[in-house]
A protein has these predicted regions:
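N-terminal alpha-helical interaction blocks
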Residues: 1-36
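Short cysteine/histidine-rich metal-coordination sites, predominantly Zn2+-binding motifs
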Residues: 67-78, 118-126
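Short Fe-S-cluster ligation motifs
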Residues: 80-97, 134-139, 143
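Short, non-ligating residues that shape and space the ligands of small metal-coordination modules
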Residues: 59-63, 109-115
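Short, flexible, mixed-charge glycine/proline-rich loop motifs
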Residues: 37-50, 91-97
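Short Cys/His-rich Zn2+-coordinating modules
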Residues: 28-43, 81-89
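Short cysteine-rich clusters marking metal-coordination/redox-active sites
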Residues: 53-56, 103-106
Length: 147
């Protein structure tokens, strides 16, 4: 069973941003701007990656997963571990996950990927239950130019 859907990878944007930093067009202070909440989330909820920080090259990056969804309530907008993501996926309808890489030494941070988890929303039936055809006339379903 595939859990992640609608995956968006931001690797090209990352490469482009790093090229700007390495060429001097973008300052290091502009990309090393992780706020304290993100750094704290990296410490307690993050997963250590195998990738070294592209800016300071002093430590491995930490991956932090953030969840967002209207029906998540207080959980929305918080960092979650991989185990918590699996649990949330079984309990809630669709919600989005944003994975951010962060360096706890120099505060580099960048969105790595985003995807959707949770039970897929059920599609609405195209025909009424029971298989009978609708008795609506064409005019009832028609739209006017002002709509």
């Amino acid at each position: 069973m595939r859990l992640q859907r609608q995956v968006v990878d931001y690797a090209l944007r990352r490469r482009s941003l790093l090229a700007e930093v390495y060429s001097g067009r973008t300052g290091v202070s502009e990309v090393c701007d992780a706020n304290p909440y993100l750094l704290r989330a990296a410490k307690f909820h993050g997963k250590l990656s195998t990738v070294m920080c592209p800016i300071c090259r002093k430590e491995q990056l930490t991956l932090v997963s953030w969840v967002f969804g209207d029906h998540l309530g207080a959980v929305s907008g918080s960092a979650r571990t991989a185990e918590e993501l699996v649990l949330l996926a079984t309990r809630f309808e669709e919600f989005s996950v944003h994975v951010v890489e962060v360096c706890r030494t120099c505060s580099w941070n960048h969105l790595v990927k985003s995807y959707v988890l949770g039970a897929a929303r059920k599609a609405r039936p195209t025909r009424p239950p029971g298989g009978s055809r609708s008795t609506r006339t064409a005019r009832d379903g028609a739209r006017t130019a002002s709509e």
